Amino acid sequence: MAELVRVAVDAMGGDNAPEEIVKGCIMAANDFGEIITLVGKKDIISEHLKKAGYNGDRIKIQNAEEVISGDDEPTTAIRQKKDSSLRVGLDMLHKGQGDVMVSAGNTGALITGATLIVKRIKGVRRVALAPLMPAETGCFLLVDGGANVCLLYTSPSPR
């Protein structure tokens, strides 16, 4: 039997969090059976689990009292909000307490935190975003490798 994947989820990041995040994690736990750790404000998450009627053993809670908002500057937030749901989830991943980390929160903070805390694989210089996108026939992987502009030579402005 295959080993279960341990998924750390930033329960406080994203639109309509944590309620919609908790609902989605309940669906995932029921459908896929993975071990999910919701990272965020324990009392609020517990309330949403209870409200949804969840009483299974596949969802755990890791308390984190701070939240990184979409308005926070990524590097500052990762460095200063050490008890944020995003930072604690990345720390769990780095320490081997999870196999996967998912967040719908501040993308810049997620990429910055992953780079500073979890680190890149040797030989990888730049990260890429790779979300699964729904399609009529299932889903597809969309890779955003970013764009780099290289100025090869300079010339006088055409003005």
Tell me the role of every PLM-derived stretch.
Residues 1-104, 109-115:
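Contiguous, glycine/small-aliphatic-enriched amphipathic segments in soluble metabolic enzymes
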Residues 17, 151-152:
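Secondary-structure boundary/capping motif
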Residues 67-69, 147-150:
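A short, flexible beta-alpha/helix-coil linker loop
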Residues 113-145:
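Short, acidic/small-residue loops that bind anionic groups at enzyme active sites
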Residues 139, 150-151:
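C-terminal extensions
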Residues 153-159:
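Conserved small/polar residues in nucleotide/adenosyl-binding loops
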